[in-house]
Design a protein with these regions (language model features):
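Alpha-helical transmembrane-bundle signature of multi-pass membrane transport and export proteins
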Residues: 1-276, 280-283
């Protein structure tokens, strides 16, 4: 799921960059085509019988959302997994939304360099997700989350260290960028940030599903999406405030990298298996 999600995001952002400056009606047509494609694709999803067919739908969105979140908090493992997943989206939102400006200012690159960095980030997440699943061998191993958080922290700090002294005025192409010796450590670190993001998120998604009962699982996923959205909006607000006050993407990336530390402490306090206790086999 992680792999597919970020590959889709990668293609979407590359396509968005490619169509910048084209007439608005072309953008509108592309959006409609993507929407139609998603709708058609959903028709091929296998049908699954409802596990809680008697669930009443609350038509008041605000009241229904509050009720769902209140119910989710009572399930400690589910809520803990949701907070961890939402932090992953918080980090991802900060990196990807600020990456175009970061590429211009600190790497001196144009849109093609941005697309390269975004591709490396997405490839890293896909590779990390696949390897984490392979290493887990069909078991839930929450210790990989701690490994991922450690990697995100270290690589985030290294990225800031590698680029904080760079400040470019003009924009250069991808061949110029690849001719710079300092570019390769930056590319490697960006890939590793995505890689450890995959290790961080995959066990949490597994835990979310295995910790939920069959009758509550769909509602747990819904609650997860709501909290994910709240965290991503919070990421946008934090980014706007810090950039307004300090005008420094490096500072923003530094704070996000260090933010993995209190998040890890929170997760470990709520579940000791994040320190490497015995794994449990996934439910079929």
């Amino acid at each position: 799921m992680n792999r597919g999600t970020f590959v889709a995001i990668l293609f979407g952002q590359i396509l968005g960059t490619a169509v910048a400056g084209v007439p608005p009606y072309i953008v509108g047509i592309l959006v409609l085509l993507v929407a139609v494609g998603g709708t058609v694709g959903s028709l091929f999803m296998p049908s699954v019988p409802a596990k809680a067919a008697d669930t009443q739908i609350e038509w008041n969105i605000v009241r229904g959302t509050k009720s769902l979140l209140r119910e989710t908090v009572r399930y400690k493992p589910v809520f803990t997994a949701i907070i961890g997943i939402s932090w992953f989206w918080f980090v991802g939102a900060v990196y990807t939304t600020q990456l175009p400006t970061f590429t211009q200012i600190h790497l001196g690159g144009n849109d093609n360099v941005f697309n390269l960095m975004l591709a490396l980030f997405s490839i890293g997440i896909a590779a990390g997700s696949v390897l984490c699943a392979k290493f887990s061998r069909e078991r839930l191993m929450l210790a990989w989350v701690t490994v991922g958080a450690l990697g995100l922290t270290v690589c985030g700090l290294v990225l800031v260290w590698l680029t904080h002294g760079h400040r470019f005025e003009g924009l250069n192409g991808i061949f110029w960028f690849l001719s710079q010796g300092w570019a390769y450590p930056v590319m490697a670190v960006m890939t590793l940030i995505g890689f450890f993001g995959g290790f961080f998120s995959v066990p949490l998604y597994t835990w979310l599903q295995t910790a939920s009962s069959e009758t509550f699982r769909a509602r747990a996923v819904a609650a997860n999406n709501i909290v994910n959205g709240i965290f991503m909006v919070s990421a946008a607000v934090l980014s706007a405030v810090l950039l307004f006050l300090f005008d420094s993407i490096s500072l923003l990336y530094l704070i996000v990298a260090l933010g993995n530390i209190p998040l890890s402490v929170f997760l470990i306090k709520r579940e000791r298996r994040f320190l490497g206790a015995a794994a449990i086999r996934k439910k079929p």
